[in-house]
Curated annotation (Swiss-Prot):
Region described as Fe-S binding site A: spans on this chain: 186-200
Subunit description: Monomer.
Organism: Medicago truncatula (Barrel medic)
Domain notes: The C-terminal domain binds 2 Fe-S clusters but is otherwise mostly in an intrinsically disordered conformation.
Region (Fe-S binding site B): 226-240
Function noted in UniProt: Component of the cytosolic iron-sulfur (Fe-S) protein assembly (CIA) machinery. Required for the maturation of extramitochondrial Fe-S proteins. Part of an electron transfer chain functioning in an early step of cytosolic Fe-S biogenesis, facilitating the de novo assembly of a [4Fe-4S] cluster on the cytosolic Fe-S scaffold complex. Electrons are transferred from NADPH via a FAD- and FMN-containing diflavin oxidoreductase.
Short sequence motif named Cx2C motif 1, residue ranges: 226-229
Protein name: Anamorsin homolog
The organism's place on the tree of life at top rank: Eukaryota
GO molecular function, one term: 2 iron, 2 sulfur cluster binding
């Protein structure tokens, strides 16, 4: 790809006092681009002594860092590179031709971690002494909607040609007959009382029903089979004849005065 069309503005930085343009072109060729001679890069020497690049923010397509020393201020430089790069711009870091042999082996792993923490993406080591990274095309704080994948429910294939069994064919004539209820000779009404000429046994059952209530004998001589009748409703059985009366002592007779119901006024 033509480098002049791909990179409109190129910035080259180095910690040396002099940087030949040929070294900048060689670094750009490592990206697989042709026609680098058409580029007109802006070169900054002794960049380690600068706190800020004399370049406007988001104005550069490609930043090439060529460094000789291993202790260059990478943290400060990455922030400046991010500032001057356009969204989606590329940075290329490589060691100088005058660097010590084997120094890149120690520099590359450390650079990858620092570039990642600084906010770069698509970090890639091209050679033992060259590393490439990109500035993300999105901005910090930007948001976008996630497309929800709509999964279609599985369709059930129904074979209408298959033989279906009629449910009614499984019932016999006896199953379809309504059951006959046993009818008594008493008139069945809402009260269900036995008639005068009852012969079904309802009259005998009604005679056996015990009506709960207090007799005069129970009031005068209270007796308790369970021993809890005089303790109150909380201790009485559900069928206790004394239910509803206040607590009393068994065998004790309570006498009221003659003027108990007389008005005080």
């Amino acid at each position: 790809m033509d480098a002049a069309k791909m990179y409109g503005a190129v910035l080259a930085c180095t910690d040396e006092a002099v940087l030949p343009v040929s070294q900048v072109f060689d670094a750009i060729r490592e990206l697989g681009n042709e026609g680098v001679e058409k580029l007109d890069p802006l070169v900054i020497t002794s960049a380690s002594s600068l706190s800020k690049f004399p370049v406007e923010s988001s104005s550069v397509d490609l930043v090439v860092l060529i460094w000789k020393s291993l202790d260059f201020p990478i943290d400060q430089l990455t922030q400046e590179v991010l500032r001057v790069l356009k969204a989606g711009g590329t940075t290329l870091i490589r060691k100088s031709s005058q660097s010590a042999v084997g120094s890149g082996d120690k520099m590359i792993p450390d650079l990858e971690n620092k570039l990642l923490l600084a906010g770069f993406s698509e970090i890639q080591a091209l050679q033992s002494s060259v590393i490439k990274a990109k500035k993300p095309s999105w901005k910090i704080g930007s948001s976008f909607a996630l497309k929800k994948v709509v999964k279609s429910s599985p369709k059930v294939q129904i074979d209408f040609d298959s033989d279906l069994i009629d449910e009614n064919s499984l019932l016999s004539e006896e199953d379809l007959k309504k059951p006959e209820l046993p009818s008594g000779d008493c008139e069945i009404g809402p009260t269900r009382k036995a008639c005068k000429n009852c012969s079904c046994g309802r009259a005998e059952e009604e005679e056996k029903v015990l009506k709960l209530g207090l007799t005069a004998e129970q009031i005068n001589n209270p007796q308790s089979a369970c021993g809890s009748c005089g303790l109150g409703d909380a201790f009485r059985c559900s069928t206790c004849p004394y239910k509803g009366l206040p607590a009393f002592k068994m065998g004790e007779k309570v006498a009221l005065s003659g003027n108990f119901l007389a008005a005080d006024i």
